[in-house]
């Protein structure tokens, strides 16, 4: 049985941005409602969120937590399966995944937190890569890969390119089919890797990206 029939994805919504602004969180909620409407119209039964649901790593505001619960419940009711990838902003530490800010949504029906590599059939769903995990990627042959990757030579914004600091590279995915990633907010494609871009512009740096 296929891992999914038709999937809808979004990424980098950053609930809690702008000092846990209610205006921003309302914008996020409006996007989720719109996204569900579009996904239903296209017949998507599965949702994959590609990381950075929250903005603040070290603390989650109570108001923002309430937005998270209500919108995760909304997604869980709309899809048969919702996979929520842990991005770097969802993790307390940048270099390990032992603590994340999303555990309290784990028991919402149809919600699946992806805090460890999930490989099934021809699909891989990968959280923020830590330590030397990237070395496993070259051996992968999955048709579809979803993750929150920090790949060199992609644009971090319209002006600044991610430098090559060693480690994970775009060419490591050469054995895979299509790769879809969150993290960089500018929508862009290089080889078989697509950065989807954030859900909507969060500031002037994101405008028209």
Region locations from a protein language model:
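A structural signal for the main folded, soluble domain(s) of proteins
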Residues: 2-6, 33-34, 131-133, 145, ...
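Active-site-proximal beta-strand elements of phosphoester/diester hydrolases
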Residues: 5-17, 121-130, 144-148, 194-197
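Core catalytic region of metal-dependent phosphoesterases/phosphodiesterases
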Residues: 6, 13, 17-118, 172-176
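Hydrophobic/aromatic beta-strand patches that form the interior of the parallel beta-sheet core
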Residues: 8, 48, 83, 114, ...
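Active-site glycine-centered loops adjacent to acidic/histidine catalytic or metal-binding residues
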Residues: 12, 51-52, 87-88, 148, ...
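Conserved protein kinase catalytic core
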Residues: 15-18, 58, 93, 133, ...
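Binuclear metal-dependent hydrolase catalytic cores centered on His/Asp/Glu-rich metal-binding motifs
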Residues: 117-171
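Conserved beta-sheet core of the metallophosphoesterase superfamily
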Residues: 151, 157-209
């Amino acid at each position: 049985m296929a891992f999914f029939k038709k999937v809808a994805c979004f990424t980098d919504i950053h609930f809690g941005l702008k000092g846990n602004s209610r205006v921003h969180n309302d914008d996020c909620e409006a996007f989720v409602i719109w996204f569900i409407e579009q996904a239903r119209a296209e017949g998507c039964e599965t949702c994959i969120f590609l990381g950075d649901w929250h903005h603040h790593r070290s603390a989650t505001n109570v108001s923002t937590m309430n937005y998270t619960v209500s919108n995760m419940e909304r997604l869980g009711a709309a899809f048969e399966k919702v996979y929520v990838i842990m991005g770097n902003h969802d993790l307390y530490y940048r270099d390990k995944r032992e603590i994340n800010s999303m555990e309290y949504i784990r028991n919402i029906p149809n919600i699946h937190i992806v805090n460890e590599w999930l490989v099934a059939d021809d699909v891989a769903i990968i959280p923020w890569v830590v330590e030397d995990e990237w070395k496993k990627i070259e051996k992968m042959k999955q048709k579809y890969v979803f993750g929150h990757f920090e790949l060199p030579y992609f644009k971090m914004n319209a002006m600044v390119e991610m430098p090559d600091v060693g480690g994970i590279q775009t060419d490591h995915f050469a054995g895979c089919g299509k790769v879809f990633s969150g993290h960089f907010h500018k929508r862009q494609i290089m080889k078989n890797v697509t950065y989807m871009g954030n859900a909507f512009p969060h500031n002037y740096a994101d405008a028209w990206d």
